[in-house]
Every structure is written in C-alpha cells, then in structure tokens.
C-alpha cells in the first residue's frame, strides 16, 4: 500500500497558514445584538475567569457544570476527533477544550507507518470554537490506518481510520439523536458506548441535538464529544446539527435569514449571528464529505 505513504510524504511539510488569530477576543461574534454579545461565554475571551453561574438561563447543564473547563486535566486538552472518507478524500476534525494563553495553538496530524508515527499536516486551532481540520486527498480506503493528533507536547488523541467495508454483505449504522444533558452521567455514556461496541457499527450517525446548552454551544459540543469519543475515534462519524445545537427551540432556517429572536424565532431564520451558526457547523460538520453545491445561504451561512 505504497500509495497512501507517497501521499503522506508529499504532504509531510504542508501547513495551512492563516492570519493571526486573536484567541483572547472577548466578542468574537460581534455586538450587533444581545444574542451576539451573550453566547459561548464559557469558551471565549478570558474563559478561565468566567463565573458559570452568570452565563444565563438558556445554557442548560452548562450553568450547573460550568467550571468543568477550568478543571480539565491539561493532558486531555485535545478532547476528541471525528472523520469521514469519501471518493478518496479523508476529512478529520479535532476538538480542543478552550486553551490557555501559554498553551499550543496548532495541531499535528500523524499516521503510523511501519510502527512509527509520520507527520502529515499541521493546522491551526480555530477560534471561536477551538476546532482543527485536516483534509487529505488521494486517500487509499482499502487499508486501516492508525492516526494521532498532537497538540504540541501538551496533549494527544489517537484513533483508527477504518478501511471502506465494501467486502461486507451488511453495513451496520448506529443512529442516535437528542443527547440530553439532564441526567447523572454528565461527561460519560458508558453503557451506551459499551452497547455500541458490541454491535461494532461501520458508521455512526448523530441526527441532531447533540447538545441542549443553546448559547453555550462549545461547552455542549465538548460534553457530547467526550461522552462518545471512545466510539467515534475509530469509525466514520456523521453529525447533523438540529435546532438546539444552534440555540433554538425549533429550527426555522428559512434560507439563512436573520431572526429578531421573538416568540422562539417564529419569524423565521436564525436568532444567533451567522458567525455563531457557522462555528457550530464547522465543529459538527466540517468532517463530512464535500457538499454537491457549497454555495452559502443568506448571511454567508454554510451548507
């Protein structure tokens, strides 16, 4: 299987360069509306100083468990990853907990070759949202390949890129949705994950409402990801955001128009700013196969 390693070596020095990212920006979604000024507070600016009890009534379990970010073992700062591969394109998203000023802000993707880790790409941690994204073309989907994401020397996360199960008579898909935080298992789903492992699905499909923390979306997304990291790390995963993922009680999308936020946004569109919606979509869906038509809808919201 030399093809995959030819690709790896060709990409070994590839790094996406972007303009300087201000990881301490206190208003990354702007100040045009109250929704823009009051979202993702537990994961932006000087997040380590925020009193979780002040983040608002719409944040569900984030208020009750809001100090979670402050107590995370920093060796686990790189929390989880999810991927798909389709038509010879591998797409991987990694997710960090909010990072402190003196911690690394880029992540390296490595594949294991002949027992050794080989660097493929290095990409910046994006802000807001603290996600990282890798795209590998000419992917050989006929072999299993171990992968590792490394946040400098601080933290790492390992998994397996599974080969395409085209030799199987039956493809097993695990479908889950509506991951309520209102229970004792705050950051685990031990029984569910154990049962999933018994079925060993070829594909995971999370059909929406991965969290219910509304305006504290990064908090809820990390809660979800930590809960399911052990099953997502070694098989393709599809996540599709629904209403609660972007802070709504119902999803009124309406081509991406802006909502005034009254009566549950029943006037149509999105209550939260497009930059917030795009952050959620980036966190949850960047790893999906490329869309047939990538033209954004109104406000520049992605598809």
Regions found by a protein language model. Name each.
Residues 17-19:
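Boundary at the C-terminal end of the N-terminal hydrophobic targeting segment
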């Amino acid at each position: 299987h030399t093809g995959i390693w030819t690709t790896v070596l060709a990409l070994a020095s590839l790094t996406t360069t972007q303009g300087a990212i201000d990881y301490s920006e206190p208003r990354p979604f702007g100040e045009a509306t109250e929704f823009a000024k009051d979202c993702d507070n537990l994961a932006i600016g000087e997040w380590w100083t925020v009193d979780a009890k002040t983040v608002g009534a719409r944040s569900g379990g984030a208020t009750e468990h809001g100090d979670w970010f402050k107590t995370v073992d920093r060796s686990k700062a790189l929390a989880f990853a999810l991927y798909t591969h389709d038509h010879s394109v591998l797409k991987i998203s990694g997710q960090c907990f909010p990072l402190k000023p003196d911690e690394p802000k880029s992540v390296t993707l490595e594949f294991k070759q002949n027992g050794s880790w080989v660097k493929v790409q290095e990409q910046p941690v994006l802000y807001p949202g603290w996600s990282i994204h890798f795209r590998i073309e000419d992917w050989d989907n006929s072999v299993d390949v171990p992968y590792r994401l490394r946040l400098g020397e601080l933290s790492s996360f390992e998994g397996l890129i599974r080969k395409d199960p085209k030799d199987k008579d039956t493809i097993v898909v695990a479908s889950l949705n509506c991951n309520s935080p209102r229970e004792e298992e705050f950051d685990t789903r031990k029984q569910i994950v154990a049962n999933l492992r018994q079925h060993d699905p070829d594909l995971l499909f999370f059909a929406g409402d991965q969290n219910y923390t509304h305006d504290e979306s990064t908090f809820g997304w990390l809660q979800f990801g930590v809960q399911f990291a052990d099953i997502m790390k070694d098989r393709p995963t599809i996540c599709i955001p629904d209403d609660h993922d972007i802070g709504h009680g119902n999803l009124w999308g309406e081509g991406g128009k802006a909502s005034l936020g009254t009566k549950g946004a029943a006037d149509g569109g999105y209550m939260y700013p497009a930059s917030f919606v795009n952050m959620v979509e980036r966190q949850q869906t960047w790893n999906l196969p490329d869309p047939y038509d990538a033209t954004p809808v109104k406000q520049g919201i992605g598809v």
